[in-house]
Amino acid sequence: MNSKFIVIEGLEGAGKTTARNIVVETLRSHGVKEVLFTREPGGTPLAEKLRELIKQGMADEKVTDKAEVLMLYAARVQLVDNVIKPALADGKWVIGDRHDLSSQAYQGGGRGIDQQLLRSLRDTVLGNFRPDLTLYLDLPPAIGLQRARQRGELDRIEQESLAFFDRTRTRYQALAAEDDSILTIDASQSIDAVSADIQAALQQWLQQQGLQPVVQVQY
């Protein structure tokens, strides 16, 4: 069984943790036993330090938009080369909480950084490495931000304006529309409905990969 890299994407408050649990349950019901979880930015000692800078910023210096995106790609290549690729080579399935699509949407859409620059960075840093499947949890930014506020204090990016997240969502939607490996899930529904949609979409994809549910034999 070939290992796969599955990524969960979406705005703040989209329900990525719930989605991850559904993905794991579905994978295990199809016989996948070894699963590794990653998050971006983060996942290695260096990447975690960069995560803190990206999320919290600095008290005495502004983090510029280009510095932010360069830190994101530095953290990403550390994670991909030191964790994700070795895990895949070892036969593990990897479930990522965010990957490159986040940079294309947040920095490209939200920040307005040139898309060609972002694609050039992606291709230079990651080569042709891409997720096998991305589940994009789509919901209106106002709903997501309300959920995020209920979790507690907002980080530097979560404190951005509603217009920022509107631009980010628009870019997410455009990217999902042009890439068959990105499946869009309506995350504004109830938890049960979202879970059912994720499970159905993932089961169909797994069947396309040649994986069927494991039948439990009763004695």
UniProtKB/Swiss-Prot annotation:
Disulfide bonds: none annotated. GO terms for biological process: dTDP biosynthetic process; dTTP biosynthetic process; dUDP biosynthetic process. Its EC number is 2.7.4.9. Transmembrane segments: none annotated. CDD domains: TMPK. The keyword Cytoplasm does not apply. InterPro entries: P-loop_NTPase (IPR027417), Thymidylate_kin-like_dom (IPR039430), Thymidylate_kin_CS (IPR018095), Thymidylate_kinase (IPR018094). This is Thymidylate kinase. GO terms for cellular component: cytosol. GO terms for molecular function: ATP binding; dTMP kinase activity.
